[in-house]
């Protein structure tokens, strides 16, 4: 009896270690760089900088996840779309002096149209996504250069820059501490705990699979603790960055879509077995079309955010961004074969890459070695996925 319980505990621990391996790796990397940077990595100002620097990666990675879920497909055009939308925003706002909010709406609409263009060729003409998005990468890079004519446009007005470089004000006059930020963190942590408890009660009543209890306890303690630590750290600087609100909305909305909606289930079904999904009545063409339309929409959001952070529209903006997004997805647990991956995992993957980049920069590691390290990390992450599936089979 005792042997059986020990075996069950070992099995449960092993499953949870596999499930939370990237979270454990992220914590380990943060501790390593916190020590090697002489406790500079997690100072309040640098944490704010990490959020500003990696906002575009998180936005793009969430969209890329939906493409990967459809069967391991990727979108190579997102970096060029980011650059093109930034150039379009610069042309409208700086050159043509158009209203900032109208310009933002036009840029987002342009992103949707670009996604529909890609989605049409992929879903209805059935050209492989790799080819379509490769042509998109070249096409929109060229359009960026044409729009900017090789020049960098600046500066953007303050009303636009605040979207990516501003902070929310404090409602309380506490010196050197943003109490509003701390209260928001406490409320977010409490809401998370309540939602997790009610979700587990609902699953138990319906006799659904609840997962391992150890994992549940770890999640309900660790994630609120992380939220509170981040809130406290930001409160010691300038408070909540405005871009953090954009990220929170995107992450929460897409986590809900992928976990709680029919559209989300269709994505996982398509990635699991496209033929079976089609035979079961799922409109696979529509799923592909919407996944790639959504990807370019989020690329437009990332383009607006990045242009605001850069405070200019530059011809080189967006270069290599698709690799950061793809890397964040695979490091965060998305399967190279499709059908597996979560928004939470992608968020961890994006933060992991951000901490890795920032930590190596502070330590003084050159950009050449940084690329080598990131390449090896991505390779090992995908290899871990492949080996895990082989063992399961």
What are these regions (language model features)?
Residues 292-305, 309-372:
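Transmembrane alpha-helical segments in multi-pass inner-membrane proteins
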Residues 197-211, 252-292:
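Membrane-helix/interface signature in polytopic inner-membrane proteins
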Residues 39-49, 149, 231-244, 255-259, ...:
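Inter-helical junctions in multi-pass inner-membrane proteins, predominant
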Residues 53, 129, 158, 176-186, ...:
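Loop-to-transmembrane alpha-helix initiation sites
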């Amino acid at each position: 009896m005792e042997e059986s319980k020990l075996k069950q505990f070992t099995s449960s621990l092993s499953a949870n270690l596999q499930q939370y391996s990237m979270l454990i790796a992220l914590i380990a990397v943060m501790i390593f760089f916190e020590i090697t940077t002489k406790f500079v990595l997690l100072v309040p100002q640098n944490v704010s900088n990490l959020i500003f620097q990696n906002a575009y990666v998180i936005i793009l990675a969430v969209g890329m996840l939906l493409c990967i879920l459809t069967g391991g497909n990727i979108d190579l055009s997102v970096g060029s779309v980011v650059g093109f939308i930034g150039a379009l925003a610069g042309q409208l706002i700086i050159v043509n002096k158009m209203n900032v909010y109208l310009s933002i709406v036009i840029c987002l609409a342009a992103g949707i149209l670009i996604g529909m263009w890609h989605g049409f060729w992929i879903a209805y003409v059935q050209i492989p996504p790799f080819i379509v998005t490769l042509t998109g990468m070249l096409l929109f890079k060229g359009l960026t250069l044409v729009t900017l004519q090789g020049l960098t446009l600046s500066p953007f007005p303050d009303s636009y820059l605040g979207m990516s470089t501003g902070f929310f004000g404090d409602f309380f006059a506490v010196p050197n501490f943003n109490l509003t930020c701390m209260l928001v963190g406490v409320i977010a942590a409490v809401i998370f705990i309540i939602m997790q408890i009610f979700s587990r009660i609902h699953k138990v009543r319906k006799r659904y699979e609840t997962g391992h209890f150890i994992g549940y306890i770890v999640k309900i303690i660790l994630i609120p603790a992380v939220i509170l630590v981040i809130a406290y750290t930001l409160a010691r600087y300038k408070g909540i960055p405005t871009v953090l609100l954009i990220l929170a909305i995107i992450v929460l909305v897409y986590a809900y879509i992928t976990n709680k909606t029919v559209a989300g289930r269709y994505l996982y079904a398509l990635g699991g077995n496209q033929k079976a999904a089609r035979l079961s009545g799922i409109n696979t063409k529509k799923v592909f079309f919407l996944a790639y339309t959504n990807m370019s929409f989020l690329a437009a959001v990332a383009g607006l955010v990045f242009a605001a952070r850069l405070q200019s529209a530059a011809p080189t903006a967006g270069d290599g961004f698709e690799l950061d997004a793809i890397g964040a997805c695979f490091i965060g647990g998305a399967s190279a074969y499709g059908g597996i991956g979560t928004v939470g995992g992608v968020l961890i993957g994006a933060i992991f890459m951000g901490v890795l980049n920032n930590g190596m920069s502070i330590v003084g590691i050159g950009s050449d070695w940084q690329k080598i390290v990131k390449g090896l990390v991505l390779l090992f992450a995908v290899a871990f996925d492949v080996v895990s599936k082989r063992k399961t089979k």
